[in-house]
């Protein structure tokens, strides 16, 4: 979400969590850290606030999360084990979600390692951190959902599914993967703006598939 208005629009349509994207090497939607903090303060109780960050330095991560005032940090790139340790010890109330980009069989091992490191959940996305300019989300592309289901079966923590989801495919995605939750960005936007009609159709698709 890029503004308080967008955040409240998502909440009004039933969103359980709000994603706030900090500076990224590529992709749509990053907003300044001070705006992230302002939106996080404005979100009503009971709605989770996710800070999406590409930072990997443990000290930088802790400082950014503390400043943002969110209740969940979504790590979109690989981080050293020390980052998990520091986040857990210094910010124990903040949930840790590790993103794994599904580009092949190695994603299974990456998810298992992340789960073993003590994260609260794993989120599967369709970025590519191996590119010269990393793509760490917001690609609008799907990935192999059969592989996503395998990952869900292999890890002991909740799994979120992202990557190219929209109203037309989210029902199939939920049926095939059975994730804990789904994450959407480009699939509910038109020319970069949150689209009320697309959002309503997406939420309806999620509810129909989950009933």
Predicted regions and their residues:
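Conserved N-terminal beta1-alpha1 strand-loop-helix module at the mouth
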Residues: 1-181, 186-211
């Amino acid at each position: 979400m890029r503004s308080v208005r967008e955040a409240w629009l998502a909440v009004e349509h039933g969103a359980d969590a709000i994603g706030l994207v900090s500076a990224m090497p590529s992709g749509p939607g990053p907003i300044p850290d001070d705006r992230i903090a302002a939106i996080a303060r404005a979100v009503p109780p009971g709605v989770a606030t996710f800070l999406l960050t590409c930072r990997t330095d443990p000290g930088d991560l802790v400082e950014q999360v503390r400043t943002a005032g969110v209740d969940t940090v979504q790590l979109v790139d690989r981080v050293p084990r020390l980052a998990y340790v520091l986040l857990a010890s210094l910010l124990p109330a903040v949930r840790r979600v590790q993103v794994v980009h599904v580009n092949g069989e190695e994603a299974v091992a990456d998810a298992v390692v992340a789960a073993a490191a003590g994260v609260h959940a794993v989120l599967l996305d369709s970025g590519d951190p191996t590119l010269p300019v990393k793509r760490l989300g917001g690609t609008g592309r799907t990935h192999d959902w059969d592989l996503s289901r395998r990952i869900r079966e292999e890890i002991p923590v909740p799994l979120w599914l992202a990557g190219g989801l929209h109203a037309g495919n989210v029902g199939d995605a939920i049926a095939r993967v059975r994730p804990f939750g789904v994450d959407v960005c480009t699939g509910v936007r038109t020319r970069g703006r949150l689209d009320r009609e697309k959002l309503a159709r997406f939420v309806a698709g999620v509810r129909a598939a989950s009933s």
